[in-house]
Amino acid sequence: MERTFIAIKPDGVQRGLVGTIIQRLESRGYQLVGLKLVQVSQELAEAHYAEHKERPFFHSLVKFITSGPVVAMVWQGKGVIAAARKLIGKTNPLEAEPGTIRGDFGIDIGRNLIHGSDGVETAQREIALWFDESELVSWTPVAQSWIYE
């Protein structure tokens, strides 16, 4: 089963959107297998955003993600990476469609509430970076037979 990493950034936590965001993913039928509230270290932030290290906005990304608590999550399900990206919406909330998390709750590209892995390899790297395998729970929701054939 496919897995993805999703993080509710400090602005989403401070604005009280954690429950709303989790509910949207659960309502789609995706399964939460890992969750923790983290005060992100400088080291973790720099590793997470390593691909942007040479970009002019790298330091502002690191500063923001370390500015408050982050809810780190691992979700699993059929096509979860693409579906979660669609549910999250475009990076710039002003361009995100209504009905997406960023379209409904975001205003500023620098405060866009949530991060989601953009592909299988990225998801694997981010999950390994943020979670130890022992922190991920293998379980079967009773509703699973009503969601998947």
From Swiss-Prot:
Gene Ontology cellular-component annotations: cytoplasm
Subcellular localization: Cytoplasm
Binding site for ATP: 9, 57, 85, 91, 102, 112
Cofactor(s) the protein needs: Mg(2+)
GO molecular function terms listed in the Swiss-Prot or TrEMBL record: ATP binding; metal ion binding; nucleoside diphosphate kinase activity
GO biological process: CTP biosynthetic process; GTP biosynthetic process; UTP biosynthetic process
Keyword tags: ATP-binding, Cytoplasm, Kinase, Magnesium, Metal-binding, Nucleotide metabolism, Nucleotide-binding, Phosphoprotein, Transferase
CDD domains: NDPk_I
Pathway stated in the Swiss-Prot or TrEMBL entry: Purine metabolism
EC number from the UniProt entry: 2.7.4.6
Recorded catalytic activity of this chain's protein: dZDP + ATP = dZTP + ADP; a 2'-deoxyribonucleoside 5'-diphosphate + ATP = a 2'-deoxyribonucleoside 5'-triphosphate + ADP; a ribonucleoside 5'-diphosphate + ATP = a ribonucleoside 5'-triphosphate + ADP
Major location (coarse): cytoplasm
Function: Major role in the synthesis of nucleoside triphosphates other than ATP. The ATP gamma phosphate is transferred to the NDP beta phosphate via a ping-pong mechanism, using a phosphorylated active-site intermediate.
Alphabetized PANTHER family for the sequence: NUCLEOSIDE DIPHOSPHATE KINASE (PTHR11349)
This protein's name: Nucleoside diphosphate kinase
Organism: Synechococcus sp. (strain JA-2-3B'a(2-13))
Lineage of the species this protein comes from: Bacteria, Bacillati, Cyanobacteriota, Cyanophyceae, Synechococcales
